[in-house]
């Protein structure tokens, strides 16, 4: 296998079987495992068509002829090929004559242990790669946060026994760089925790190390706080989580499909429970005071009442002029103010 795995020089390996996993205590049994040639590298799973027939639109580096049918219990045919991501020139080394990888595809390589005191590329699916100075410790590079950036040869084995599921995010103000052995953590600058406590919240992005096909005929519920999920469908029965602002993720049944997490492009800010204001229910009258159906339906953050417009075009509460049409409150900071329609 050639070491040049950057875009434009991709190499595919023959398809290997996908095995349905069954959750047991402490992990998964019969996980999807990559062949030995996939070890110590970063890999990108390329799923083929359900019929596993060669297609004209096959991804770059996916040899249609190597896509062989693989039968899962009670499902249609599923096959895949391993396509390596950049696995060689992950570190910018001066004076070696080697051209560095493209910034957008650079990945730390477990076989590289000479990158100490050099700049290692931190590639993440959500943003442009950034290079950070590394500190040499026992032949491996350690990032400032303590996570390994460059591992010694043989220390990283991206097998399914190590990566069985995608972890949830944790709202901790920690920024860590990418590692071949662990998911990539990206900081969402506009992301706020749903609990409204104010600390910065990160979103999880998953490295294409080892994909797990969950059991068929079962519900898969994996909420990701502060980030909508992106579903990629395959061939099983499960549920797809559809998060919404200010609400926990809502799971919707998707017949005859199952999904695996893919990297999400951007971190979107969810609606914080501190400043989710709901409009009051007001009745427009021709004259006199406006009547409202019960107390204003605001949360506990002290949202002020909106402008209940009367037919005379005045607001009895504030005395300011209002248009004789319905006013909808808009949420600004932690209070609502009237908006003229």
UniProtKB/Swiss-Prot annotation:
Region annotation (7 X 5 AA repeats of C-C-X(3)) ranges: 5-311
sequence repeat locations: 5-9, 115-119, 120-124, 150-154, 240-244, 276-280, 307-311
Q: Which cellular component terms (GO) are annotated to the entry?
A: cytosol; keratin filament
Q: State which residue ranges cross the membrane.
A: none
Recorded hits in InterPro entries, A to Z, give: KAP, Keratin_matx
Q: Which UniProt keywords apply?
A: Keratin, Repeat
* One Pfam short name: Keratin_B2_2
**Which GO molecular function annotations are given, in alphabetical order?**
structural molecule activity
User: Which family, according to the similarity comment?
Assistant: Belongs to the KRTAP type 10 family.
Q: Which PANTHER family match?
A: KERATIN ASSOCIATED PROTEIN 3-3-RELATED (PTHR23260), KERATIN-ASSOCIATED PROTEIN 26-1 (PTHR23260:SF7)
> What protein am I looking at?
Keratin-associated protein 29-1
> Which organism's genome codes for this protein?
Homo sapiens (Human)
* Organism lineage: Eukaryota, Metazoa, Chordata, Craniata, Vertebrata
């Amino acid at each position: 296998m050639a070491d040049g795995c950057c875009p434009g020089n991709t190499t595919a390996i023959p398809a290997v079987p996908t095995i349905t996993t069954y959750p047991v205590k402490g992990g998964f049994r019969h996980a999807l495992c990559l062949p030995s040639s996939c070890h110590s590298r970063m890999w990108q799973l390329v799923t083929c068509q359900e019929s596993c027939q060669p297609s004209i639109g096959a991804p770059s580096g996916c040899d249609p002829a190597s896509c062989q049918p693989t039968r899962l219990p009670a499902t249609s045919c599923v096959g895949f090929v391993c396509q390596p991501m950049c696995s060689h020139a992950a570190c910018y080394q001066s004076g070696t004559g080697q051209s560095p990888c493209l910034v957008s595809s650079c990945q730390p390589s477990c076989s590289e242990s000479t990158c100490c005191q050099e700049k290692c590329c931190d590639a993440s699916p959500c943003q442009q790669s950034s290079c950070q100075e590394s500190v040499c410790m026992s032949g491996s590079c350690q990032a400032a946060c303590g996570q390994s950036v460059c591992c010694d040869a043989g220390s990283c084995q991206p097998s399914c026994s190590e990566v069985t599921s995608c972890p949830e995010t944790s709202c901790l103000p920690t920024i860590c760089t990418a590692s071949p052995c662990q998911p990539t953590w990206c900081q969402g600058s506009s992301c706020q925790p749903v609990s409204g406590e104010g600390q910065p919240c990160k979103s999880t992005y998953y490295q294409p190390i080892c994909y797990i096909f969950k059991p068929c005929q079962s519900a898969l519920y994996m909420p990701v706080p502060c980030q909508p999920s992106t579903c990629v469908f395959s061939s099983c029965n499960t549920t797809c989580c559809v998060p919404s602002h200010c609400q926990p993720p809502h799971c919707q049944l998707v017949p005859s499909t199952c999904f695996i997490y893919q990297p999400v492009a951007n971190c979107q800010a969810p609606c914080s429970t501190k400043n989710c204001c709901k409009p009051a229910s007001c009745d427009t009258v021709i004259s006199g005071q406006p009547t409202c159906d019960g107390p204003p339906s605001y949360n506990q953050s002290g949202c002020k009442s909106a402008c209940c417009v009367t037919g005379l075009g005045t607001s009895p509460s504030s005395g300011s002029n209002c248009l004789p049409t319905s006013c909808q409150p808009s949420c600004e900071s932690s209070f609502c103010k009237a908006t003229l329609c």
